Amino acid sequence: LQTPYMDSLADNGVSFTQAYAHTVCCPSRAALLTGRHPNRGGVQSWLQGDRNGSDTHLGNMDPSEITLAEVLREAGYRTALFGKWHLGAKFGHGPLDQGFEKHFGHLSGFIDNFTHYFLHGQGYHDLYDNNEEIFRRGEYFPEMIVDEAVKYAAKHSDEPFFMMVAFNLPHY
């Protein structure tokens, strides 16, 4: 397998030798997107909550946190997230509120790859195209996000863009 672009990134990129990863995904996601310790943004543990349910138990990253997507968008980049957000489901705390102009995926921790339901507790449907809840039962979620990401890259191939593709598969 030839990977010239990946090889170039490895040869010319930055190596982080003094970094850590939290034991659960939310704090690591917050650190990756903000470049700051996740506690500063209120992300100390695993966040969960249904956007369409009660928000009394929703944990969310503080919306005042500045994300990589916000900085790049201000610099003229198109910004998109395909897949998992998991930094807050409450309105005002989603990816479209934190610098991404496009989001296709889920807001909570993980969803079933065919029903697109979050399966902890009572469970709830969690699949969105931007802020619109969509239903595509029976379609394989990893393929859906790849297809959407490829379409986005083709549409914006003549301009700079930052695309984050966050797969759900590590949870299954």
Language-model segment annotations:
Residues 1-172:
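Formylglycine-dependent sulfatase
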